[in-house]
């Protein structure tokens, strides 16, 4: 049992403290909401189609999309373009493509998951480019323009508003440079992609007027920039520096990971690279920049224990906080546009938890038919905690635990024009370890919130063991095929632990934290809501997906401006028997803390998943939202 003292009071004797005082808040875009992965298997149309159509991979993406609204907005998938199949050449030698597999996957991302792709212009599409080296530039321009116009013709330009477009991933590496680009042909390719984006039209035609093309930004070169042996990316920067106004890329993207798995390494590596680039090419300072692969260490499939437990979640949160600090510092990362995490992979046995993924994947080969079970890792919960941050943030603060170790504090607010805001969200992040003579850590936090009406607070914790499914699995002997009882035990440890919630009546109330007995590392999310904050809206798009016989994954969509004060969700079920008769409504999530919009329901061999489902939210004031629409599910 955790012994965290969390009091709303006044405390005279403290070992470390700060108050909100005259804190400066800055507009904070949520710049960390991208994930990515590379599909397994062959890199051709058949291989990529099979990989992205795999039910386990689709369930993996469905769970990632079931984080709180805004936690993940973009997904970057290598070789996604290979879903487009070359069909034939027309009489004038122009390629004709079959977009059916590409359309199916894009529809899945957009309509079911509400995710936007980061479309990397990389692939060979049946050999079109390798077989026509003299036509490559024209064919790339044609493919880019045709792909975008095809999507606009299907669904209108509004669907593409949040799409991102990027050049070939890490073109200097032989493993990716399937086209054998030279410095010259790579520049031709990038400029062809730029022309294709510029010529792709907005085909929405209203009132008979011919609309102007919509400008679409191009990101690149998605490079490692490791040394002089990476000429393709460096040459592109040279070109852009000479004539910035004609630079084909609008956002300079790079990859910098850690070495030993720390957030500091990721950020320092990014700072060093951008400082080097600006020293060589000072004209590029006007371009926004993005670290597409801001991961703790290279090699997603390499098994590492820290990637299984709370430590990876803490590292990801710390990475975000340190990038925010670097952005505010006015140095080489002042133009930071976004970072992305390459952790949307599907893990495999025997490394279910320890690979760089958001979810642990168990392939249950003993069932008929075989199926996949996915368990949320603490890093998944960490992304959900970050999604609750406000729209304005102070700089990161460090509060000493002892002479060598500090707690990182990031305070954010939303709403409220005349004061700090009607909504406050603060993340406290411990170090991974501290000295044996660590002073008992007391943390005094003054809310300093202009309270027009009643307010309430809620605290959630991410800590070892209690919010660590990996620990539960290890305690059970790490079975390859965890049974239903163990799977439920792991899922009960998925979410951040709800610690304490209650009302606040007094202006400048103080939060006191005594974390001396909490096992390190830990993260705490504190949210404070005014009663005047928008009430919970009805959950939308309730969806029921089959996992296996008598087991379903239930997810729904949140309204972006009404879930900041959410405490938990309730999932209700009304069974229908074989004769079509309905029982009473049952609260099937009784006893679960569900801060995120999903729930996996497995009633057991004697139960049934056939029937009706509905969901509602409960906020920190114990008020409920309207129920979602009722959805019927029938297992065939």
UniProtKB/Swiss-Prot annotation:
Coiled coil: none
InterPro entries reported for this sequence: GH39_C, GH39_cat, Glyco_hydro_39, Glycoside_hydrolase_SF, Glycosyl_Hydrolase_39, Ig-like_fold
Glycosylation (residues): 180, 268, 365, 448, 453, 483, 622
Cysteine-cysteine disulfides: 529-565
Active site, per annotation: 170 (proton donor), 293 (nucleophile)
Residues engaged in binding alpha-D-mannopyranose: 39, 43, 45, 300
SUPFAM superfamilies reported in the protein's UniProt record: (Trans)glycosidases, Glycosyl hydrolase domain
Classification via Gene3D superfamilies: Glycosidases, Immunoglobulins
Protein localization: Lysosome
Major localization listed first in the record, in broad terms: other
Enzyme class: hydrolase
Sorted UniProt keywords: Disulfide bond, Glycoprotein, Glycosidase, Hydrolase, Lysosome, Signal
Catalytic function, reaction form: Hydrolysis of unsulfated alpha-L-iduronosidic linkages in dermatan sulfate
GO BP term, pick one: carbohydrate metabolic process
Molecular-function annotations in GO: L-iduronidase activity
GO cellular component assignments: lysosome
Leader peptide range in chain numbering: 1-16
Consequence of gene loss (knockout): RNAi-mediated knockdown results in dysregulated glycolysis and lipogenesis, and is pupal lethal. RNAi-mediated knockdown causes the incorrect acidification of lysosomes leading to dysfunctional lysosome-autophagosome fusion and consequently, blocks autophagy flux. RNAi-mediated knockdown results in a significant increase in the number and size of lysosomes in the brain. Expression levels of genes involved in glycolysis (Pfk, Tpi and Ldh) and lipogenesis (ACC) are increased.
EC number: 3.2.1.76
Ligand binding (alpha-L-iduronate): 78, 169-170, 257, 293, 299, 342, 356
Family: Belongs to the glycosyl hydrolase 39 family.
Function, in words: Essential lysosomal hydrolase responsible for the degradation of glycosaminoglycans (GAG) such as heparan sulfate. Required for lysosome function and autophagy. Consequently, has an essential role in the development, maintenance and function of various cells, tissues, and organs, including the muscles and the central nervous system (CNS).
Annotated protein name in UniProt: Alpha-L-iduronidase
Organism for this UniProt entry: Drosophila melanogaster (Fruit fly)
Gene: Idua
């Amino acid at each position: 049992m955790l012994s965290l003292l969390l009091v709303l009071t006044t405390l005279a004797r403290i070992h470390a403290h700060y108050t909100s005082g005259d804190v400066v808040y800055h507009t904070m875009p949520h710049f960390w909401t991208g994930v990515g992965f590379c599909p397994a298997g062959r890199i051709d149309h058949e291989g990529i189609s099979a990989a992205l159509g795999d039910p386990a991979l689709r369930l993996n993406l469905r769970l990632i999309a079931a984080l709180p609204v805004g936690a993940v907005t973009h997904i970057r998938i290598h070789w996604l373009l290979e879903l487009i199949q070359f069909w034939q050449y027309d009489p004038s030698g122009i390629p004709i493509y079959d977009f059916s597999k590409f359309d199916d996957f894009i529809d899945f991302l957009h309509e079911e998951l509400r995710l936007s792709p980061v479309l990397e212009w990389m692939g060979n599409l049946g050999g079109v480019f390798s077989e026509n080296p003299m036509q490559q530039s024209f064919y790339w321009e044609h493919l880019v323009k045709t792909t975008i116009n095809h999507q606009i013709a299907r669904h209108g330009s509004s669907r593409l508003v949040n799409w991102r477009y990027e050049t070939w991933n890490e073109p200097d590496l032989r493993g990716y440079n399937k086209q054998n680009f030279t410095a010259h042909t790579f520049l031709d390719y990038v400029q062809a992609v730029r022309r294709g984006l510029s010529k792709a039209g907005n085909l929405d035609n209203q009132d008979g007027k011919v609309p102007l093309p919509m400008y679409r930004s191009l990101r690149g070169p998605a490079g490692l920039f490791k040394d002089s042996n990476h000429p393709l990316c460096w040459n592109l920067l040279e070109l852009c520096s000479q004539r910035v106004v004609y630079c084909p890329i609008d956002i300079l993207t790079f990859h910098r990971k850690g070495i030993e798995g720390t957030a500091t390494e990721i950020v320092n590596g990014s700072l060093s690279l951008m400082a080097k680039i600006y020293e060589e090419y000072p004209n590029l300072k006007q371009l926004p920049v993005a670290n597409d692969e801001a991961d703790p260490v290279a090699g997603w499939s390499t098994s590492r224990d820290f990637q299984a437990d709370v430590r990876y979640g803490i590292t990801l949160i710390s990475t975000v906080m340190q990038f925010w600090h670097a952005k505010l510092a006015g140095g080489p990362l002042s133009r930071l546009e976004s970072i992305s995490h390459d952790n949307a992979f599907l893990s495999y046995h025997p490394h279910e938890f320890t690979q760089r993924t958001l979810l642990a994947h168990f392939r249950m080969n003993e069932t008929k038919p075989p199926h996949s079970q996915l368990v949320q890792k603490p890093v998944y919960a960490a992304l959900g905690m970050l999604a609750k941050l406000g729209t304005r943030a102070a700089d990161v603060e460090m509060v000493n635990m002892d002479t060598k170790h500090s707690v990182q504090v990031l305070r954010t607010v939303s709403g409220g024009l005349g004061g700090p805001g009607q909504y406050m969200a603060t993340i406290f992040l411990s170090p991974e370890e501290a000295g044996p003579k660590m002073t008992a850590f007391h943390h005094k936090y003054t809310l300093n919130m202009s309270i027009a009406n009643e307010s309430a607070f809620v605290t959630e914790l991410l800590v070892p063991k209690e919010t660590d499914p990996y620990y539960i699995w290890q305690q059970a002997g790490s079975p390859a095929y965890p049974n239903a009882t163990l799977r439920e035990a792991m899922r009960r440890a998925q979410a951040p632990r709800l610690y304490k919630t209650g009302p606040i009546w007094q202006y400048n109330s103080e939060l006191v934290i005594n974390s001396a007995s909490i096992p390190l590392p830990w993260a705490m999310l504190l949210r404070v809501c005014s009663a005047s904050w928008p009430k919970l809206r009805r959950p939308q798009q309730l969806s029921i997906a089959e996992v296996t016989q008598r087991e379903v994954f239930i997810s729904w969509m949140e309204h972006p401006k009404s879930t900041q004060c959410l405490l938990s969700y309730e999932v209700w079920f009304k069974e229908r028997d074989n004769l079509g008769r309905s029982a009473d409504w049952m609260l099937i999530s009784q006893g679960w803390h569900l801060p995120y919009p999903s729930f996996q329901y497995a009633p057991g061999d004697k139960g049934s998943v056939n029937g009706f489902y509905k969901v509602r939210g409960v906020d920190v004031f114990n008020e409920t939202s309207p129920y979602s629409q009722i959805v019927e599910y029938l297992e065939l």
